[in-house]
């Protein structure tokens, strides 16, 4: 086909589709290839099997990858937890995000160890610089978006009914806090519309 021009391509496409019964697909994929985080294969925070969900949906809608039936550039993405490693909520039309229903598990002794400086916050991820002494009020309590946490100097309290499951406290103190046991997923449909002037 090198060197052919558009009028010749139209004839070739017609012959392929009408005489040779070849499926050429659409002019572009309306359903983008689904994406998922590594999920339970590598992450302790994954609340469901992201890889399996992504595989099953890909197999169910495989034909839509090149025979457009979805709205323009429809995207499925699967995040195993609210950390959002594949940015499902921000970058897809159909987001499946792992979450939990029950309470955040608290190890009060580990919380005290963080406050005492025995454990590095953020699992030591920012250990290259001297950030000063860990301040649970400034680094965890005050940064909670729903203000559902309280530290009385010896015990951490979480109002789980108000918790929005953002993972900030868990990421900051992973030895002290952990996701609950009643795990599942939230499904969010719809995307931001493009800004058109």
Locate each region found by the language model.
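Small-residue-enriched alpha-helical segments and adjacent helix-cap loops
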Residues: 2-124, 134, 157-164
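A glycine-rich, aromatic-flanked flexible loop/lid motif
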Residues: 26-29, 140-143, 191-193
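Short connector loops/turns at beta-strand edges and beta->alpha or beta->beta junctions
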Residues: 101, 149, 192-195
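Short Fe-S-cluster ligation motifs
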Residues: 107-138, 171-179, 195-197
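Iron-sulfur cluster-binding cysteine motifs and their immediate structural context
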Residues: 138-158, 164-186
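Accessory, usually C-terminal, subdomains that scaffold auxiliary metal cofactors
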Residues: 163-166, 192-196
């Amino acid at each position: 086909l090198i060197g052919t021009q558009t009028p010749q391509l139209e004839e070739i496409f017609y012959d392929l589709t009408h005489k040779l019964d070849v499926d050429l697909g659409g002019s572009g994929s309306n359903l983008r290839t689904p994406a998922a985080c590594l999920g339970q294969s590598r992450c302790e925070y994954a609340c469901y099997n992201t890889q399996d969900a992504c595989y099953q949906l890909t197999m169910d809608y495989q034909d839509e990858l090149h025979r457009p039936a979805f709205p323009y550039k429809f995207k499925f993405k699967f995040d195993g937890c609210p950390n959002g490693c594949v940015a499902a909520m921000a970058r897809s039309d159909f987001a499946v995000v792992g979450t939990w229903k029950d309470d955040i598990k608290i190890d009060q002794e580990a919380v005290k160890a963080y406050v005492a400086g025995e454990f590095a916050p953020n699992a030591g991820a920012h250990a290259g610089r001297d950030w000063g002494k860990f301040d649970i009020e400034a680094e965890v309590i005050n940064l909670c978006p729903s203000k559902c946490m309280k530290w009385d100097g010896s015990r951490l309290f979480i109002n789980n009914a108000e918790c929005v499951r953002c993972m900030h406290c868990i990421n900051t103190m992973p030895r002290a806090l952990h996701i609950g046991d009643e795990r599942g997923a939230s499904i969010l449909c719809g995307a931001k519309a493009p800004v058109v002037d």
